[in-house]
Amino acid sequence: MLYLEDYLEMIEQLPMDLRDRFTEMREMDLQVQNAMDQLEQRVSEFFMNAKKNKPEWREEQMASIKKDYYKALEDADEKVQLANQIYDLVDRHLRKLDQELAKFKMELEADNAGITEILERRSLELDAPSQPVNNHHAHSHTPVEKRKYNPTSHHTATDHIPEKKFKSEALLSTLTSDASKENTLGCRNNNSTASCNNAYNVNSSQPLASYNIGSLSSGAGAGAITMAAAQAVQATAQMKEGRRTSSLKASYEAFKNNDFQLGKEFSMPRETAGYSSSSALMTTLTQNASSSAADSRSGRKSKNNTKSSSQQSSSSSSSSSSSSLSLCSSSSTVVQEVSQQTTVVPESDSNSQVDWTYDPNEPRYCICNQVSYGEMVGCDNQDCPIEWFHYGCVGLTEAPKGKWFCPQCTAAMKRRGSRHK
């Protein structure tokens, strides 16, 4: 029953052996590279001076160069043999581990039948992550084209997570249509605050679709969505240029990091989301309008203190109406900005919610500096620092034919070409 202790004692010297052999392999690799560089220089000098010297000198130099080439080839073969020895060493230890595990399993089964299956299942449950990490999957059943990048190598597929293909029309159309309905109902009737309030009540009496953005619940109203989008766009604009993204993931992160609390604003049920959401939104609008009006009047001195309450109420209602109209117009502007900046959004069912949780250690790609998802294309420049790009970020809809270079590499090649001219 001391299999683990024996195996640990056996592999105690393995790291040192591997380090010594890898060091020797690196030295041999450098030796071969230096020899090849020197031989290339000798060959170039040989061809430059071949016509000036006698045939005997040419034969002698040719034989010397061949001899040195064979010496470099022998060193390269020795390096390959050393790599094979390292592989055999590690493989031998792995086979030993499998044998010890099989013996240990037989002893456990002899004492308690079926105990190994229970232990293995429990170990798998402990090793499994608490939340699914994979958010985006490409269709694994489709053949991978030459220029397409398959991101499933970076994600572990699970059976209970449906495959999602990201498009911009699904969520964007719902967002803009509901916002345009609200602006039409709430902003055309600009005579008083009551007309705008009635428009919100009419709009909120209809059942609203679920938006499925993280913890965003259904029935929140398009006005609240546009206000949240405004704060998200503002937070995204303040990010560094390399960290901006063309998907709604940055907007969702801005929702979470901003003062606009989604958990409190959108946690109401569908039954009570009709009138309560519209009244809460109208209260927010009137409070903002009254506060702005109070700030604008703070620098003035009141010359007449005997105004009637009806005049004050009418003036406050008119200012509230104008501020509400300005907020409605700004909301529509924000929706347009979001529709321009957004290129990929998830296509999901109305009953499911998108899980935006991803591994922070996962490699980033593309000019948007995001993880791999959907269809990706690779730059044919071997020195490209980014290498892989999302189709939507570089304006592609299908795999390019022939060689393809990213915008950065294309601009760099144009600069080099103009410099040579």
UniProtKB/Swiss-Prot annotation:
Region (Disordered): 129-164, 286-324
Molecular function per GO: histone H4K12 acetyltransferase activity; histone H4K16 acetyltransferase activity; histone H4K5 acetyltransferase activity; histone H4K8 acetyltransferase activity; methylated histone binding; zinc ion binding
GO cellular component: NuA4 histone acetyltransferase complex; nucleosome; piccolo histone acetyltransferase complex; Swr1 complex
Pfam families according to UniProt: ING (PF12998)
Binding-site residues for Zn(2+) 1, renumbered to this chain: 366, 368, 390, 393
Residue(s) of cross-link: Glycyl lysine isopeptide (Lys-Gly) (interchain with G-Cter in SUMO2): 148, 165, 167, 256
Low complexity composition-biased segments: 308-324
Function: Component of the NuA4 histone acetyltransferase (HAT) complex which is involved in transcriptional activation of select genes principally by acetylation of nucleosomal histones H4 and H2A. This modification may both alter nucleosome - DNA interactions and promote interaction of the modified histones with other proteins which positively regulate transcription.
Similarity comment text for this entry: Belongs to the ING family.
Subunit structure: Interacts with H3K4me3 and to a lesser extent with H3K4me2. Component of the NuA4 histone acetyltransferase complex which contains the catalytic subunit KAT5/TIP60 and the subunits EP400, TRRAP/PAF400, BRD8/SMAP, EPC1, DMAP1/DNMAP1, RUVBL1/TIP49, RUVBL2, ING3, actin, ACTL6A/BAF53A, MORF4L1/MRG15, MORF4L2/MRGX, MRGBP, YEATS4/GAS41, VPS72/YL1 and MEAF6. The NuA4 complex interacts with MYC. HTATTIP/TIP60, EPC1, and ING3 together constitute a minimal HAT complex termed Piccolo NuA4. Component of a SWR1-like complex.
Name under which the protein is recorded: Inhibitor of growth protein 3
